[in-house]
C-alpha cells in the first residue's frame, strides 16, 4: 500500500475526521512517556473497542475575562494544528471541583526560607506522599522517557556489535551561582504557594481528545498514525484484557530503530509488520512497572514534582473512581498555566530580574550534542544512552546550527527513510518537511523573566544558551525552570536526585 493510501486508510478507519489535538502544556519534551512496560489497569473503562476516544469533562462554562487571553494562546502539539483544547479556568466554580480537596501532603512542603538551615536531602518528601510520587522508576528520555532501556540491551541479544562514539560536549565556562541567595528573599515562594493552592483539575482542559491504539495494531501503522494526528503518544488498549496496558510513544519508535537497524538477524521491514502486542512481549518480557499518574485533586506542586522526579513528559490525570484518563499534564501546560497568572495577578519576585548567568539555571556541563556531519544513527545512540529528548546540532567550530529532537525521528516513518539512517543529521534537518519548534536561543546576560516569557510565547521545550558567536554554552529546559520556580523554594531538588 502506498504511503498516501495508508495515511488515508488510517485517518478513515482509525480516527475521526476532526483535526485531532493533543494537550501538551509545559513534553518535549515532552515528552514523552512510553508506558509499554507499565502494568495493566483493569479497572479502566473500555473504549468500546474503538481506536480513538474523545473525553470531555463537564460542560463548557463561561470563563472569567482574565482567562480570555489563554484561549487565544492555547498551545498545540505542533505549529499549524488548529482547534486545540480550551483551558479550564482555575477560578471556575463547579460541583466536581468542590469534591477535590486542595490540601494534599506534598502541598504542605516547607518553604526553604522557613527553616534555619537548608535541608541536606533536598528532595525528601513526607512519607505519606513519597510512594505516590516515586512509585515508578519509569524514566523518560530527557525529562520524559517512557521506560528505562538497559544499557546493554542490544548486546545481551547480540543485535548490536558496536556503537559510534558520542560527540564530545564543548567546554563551557563555569557560571556564577546566586540562586540560593534569591530563595531567601521575601516573595521567593510565591510560585511555590500558587502551585500548592491549585489542583490538577484547575489546569485541565474542558475538552480534550485522545488517540487510542489497540495492541493488535501493526507497529508501522501506529507510528504512521502518530504522525498523521500530530501527537507524540497514544494510550494502548488490550482487547483481551479489556484494559489499558500502557502508552506508545516516539521513544518506542527510536528503540525499535536502535535495536534492529544494525541487526544481522532481523531486517527492519520485518519488525514494522509486528503488532504492538508482539513488540511489548519481545522487549519487555513480562517486566511491567506501575503507571505513573496523578489525581485531579492533587496539587499542581505534586504534578511538577512527579514529572521531574520520574523524568517523564506526560502525566495522566486519572479519575479516582472509574480510572478513566481525564487529561494529560505536561511541563508545557503547567508552565503556561503559571505564566498566565504571573503576567496578570501574581507579584514578580526579584529573581526574575536576575540573569541566567547569575542564577545558574540550566545545564552547562556534559552537554549531549551531535555534529551536523554525524549520521542519524549516532543521534539515536545518544537519545538512548544519554536519555535526552533533543540534541543541539553543532558544526566543527562548535557553533549551534540546528536542533534535532525525538519528534524529528518519527518523521522518518512518514518519509519512509528509516532504512537510511546513515544520512547526516544536517541532511535530515534540510529534508524536514514540517516546521517544528526549531532552534530558539538565549544568552547569559538575559534575565530569567525574559527566558520564561520567550519559552511560553514560542511554546518550545527548551532554549539553547549561546554566546555572541553562536557557540554552545548550555541548555535551559522546562524542567530547569519549573524546578527553580516551584520546587527549589521548598528545598526539593528533583533534578539532582
UniProtKB/Swiss-Prot annotation:
Job description of the protein: AMP/ATP-binding subunit of AMP-activated protein kinase (AMPK), an energy sensor protein kinase that plays a key role in regulating cellular energy metabolism. In response to reduction of intracellular ATP levels, AMPK activates energy-producing pathways and inhibits energy-consuming processes: inhibits protein, carbohydrate and lipid biosynthesis, as well as cell growth and proliferation. AMPK acts via direct phosphorylation of metabolic enzymes, and by longer-term effects via phosphorylation of transcription regulators.
Gene3D superfamilies cross-referenced by the UniProt entry: CBS-domain
Record field: transmembrane: none
GO CC aspect terms: cytoplasm; cytosol; nucleotide-activated protein kinase complex; nucleus
SMART domains per the UniProt record, alphabetical: CBS (SM00116)
Name of this chain's protein: 5'-AMP-activated protein kinase subunit gamma-3
Effect of residue 358 to Y: In strain: Charolais
Biased composition (Basic and acidic residues): 68-79
CDD domains associated with the record: CBS_euAMPK_gamma-like_repeat1, CBS_euAMPK_gamma-like_repeat2
SUPFAM superfamilies the UniProt entry points to: CBS-domain pair
Tagged with keyword DNA damage: no
Organism, scientific name: Bos taurus
Sequence positions that bind ATP 1: 232, 247-252, 292, 313-314
Residues where ATP 2 binds: 232, 314, 332, 405-408, 432, 440, 461-462
Amino acid at each position: 500500500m502506498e504511503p498516501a493510501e495508508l495515511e488515508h486508510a488510517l485517518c478513515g478507519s482509525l480516527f475521526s475526521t476532526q483535526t485531532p489535538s493533543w494537550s501538551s502544556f509545559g513534553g518535549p519534551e515532552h515528552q514523552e512517556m512510553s508506558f509499554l512496560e507499565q502494568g495493566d489497569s483493569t479497572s479502566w473503562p473500555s473504549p468500546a473497542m474503538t481506536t480513538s476516544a474523545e473525553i470531555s469533562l463537564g460542560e463548557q462554562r463561561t470563563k472569567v475575562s482574565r482567562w480570555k487571553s489563554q484561549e487565544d494562546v492555547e498551545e498545540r502539539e505542533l505549529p499549524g494544528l488548529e482547534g486545540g483544547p480550551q483551558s479550564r479556568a482555575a477560578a471556575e466554580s463547579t460541583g466536581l471541583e468542590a469534591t477535590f480537596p486542595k490540601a494534599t501532603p506534598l502541598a504542605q512542603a516547607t518553604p526553604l526560607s522557613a527553616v534555619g538551615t537548608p535541608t541536606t536531602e533536598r528532595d525528601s518528601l513526607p512519607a505519606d506522599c513519597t510512594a505516590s510520587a516515586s512509585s515508578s522508576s519509569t524514566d523518560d528520555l530527557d525529562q520524559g522517557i517512557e521506560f528505562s532501556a538497559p544499557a546493554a540491551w542490544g548486546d545481551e541479544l547480540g543485535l548490536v556489535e558496536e556503537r559510534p562514539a558520542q560527540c564530545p560536549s564543548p567546554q563551557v565556562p563555569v557560571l556564577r551561582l546566586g540562586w540560593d541567595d534569591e530563595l531567601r528573599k521575601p516573595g521567593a515562594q510565591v510560585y511555590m504557594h500558587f502551585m500548592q493552592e491549585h489542583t490538577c483539575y484547575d489546569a485541565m482542559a474542558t475538552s480534550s481528545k485522545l488517540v487510542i491504539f489497540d495492541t493488535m495494531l501493526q507497529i508501522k501503522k501506529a507510528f504512521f498514525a502518530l504522525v498523521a494526528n500530530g501527537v507524540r503518544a497514544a494510550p494502548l488498549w488490550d482487547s483481551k484484557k479489556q484494559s489499558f496496558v500502557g502508552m506508545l510513544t516516539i521513544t518506542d519508535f527510536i528503540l525499535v530503530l536502535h535495536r534492529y537497524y544494525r541487526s544481522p538477524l532481523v531486517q527492519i521491514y520485518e519488525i514494522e509488520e509486528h503488532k504492538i502486542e508482539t513488540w511489548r512481549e519481545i522487549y519487555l518480557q513480562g517486566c511491567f512497572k506501575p503507571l505513573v499518574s496523578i489525581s485531579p485533586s492533587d496539587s499542581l506542586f505534586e504534578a511538577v514534582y512527579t514529572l521531574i522526579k520520574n523524568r517523564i513528559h506526560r502525566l495522566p490525570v486519572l479519575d479516582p473512581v472509574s480510572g478513566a484518563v481525564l487529561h494529560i499534564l505536561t511541563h508545557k501546560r503547567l508552565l503556561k498555566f503559571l505564566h498566565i497568572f504571573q503576567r496578570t495577578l501574581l507579584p514578580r519576585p526579584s529573581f526574575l530580574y536576575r540573569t541566567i548567568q547569575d542564577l545558574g539555571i540550566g545545564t552547562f556541563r556534559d552537554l549531549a550534542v551531535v555534529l551536523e556531519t554525524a549520521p542519524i544513527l549516532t543521534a539515536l545512540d545518544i537519545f538512548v544512552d544519554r536519555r535526552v529528548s533533543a540534541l543541539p546540532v553543532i558544526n566543527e567550530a562548535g557553533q549551534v546550527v540546528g536542533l534535532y529532537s525525538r519528534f524529528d525521528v518519527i518523521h522518518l516513518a512518514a518519509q519512509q527513510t528509516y532504512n537510511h539512517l546513515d544520512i547526516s543529521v544536517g541532511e535530515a534537518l534540510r529534508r524536514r518537511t514540517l516546521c517544528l519548534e526549531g532552534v530558539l536561543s538565549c544568552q547569559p546576560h538575559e534575565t530569567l523573566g525574559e527566558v520564561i516569557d520567550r519559552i511560553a510565547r514560542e511554546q518550545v521545550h527548551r532554549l539553547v544558551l549561546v554566546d555572541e558567536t553562536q557557540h554552545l554554552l548550555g541548555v535551559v529546559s522546562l524542567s530547569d525552570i519549573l524546578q527553580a520556580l516551584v520546587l527549589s523554594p521548598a528545598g526539593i531538588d528533583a533534578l539532582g536526585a
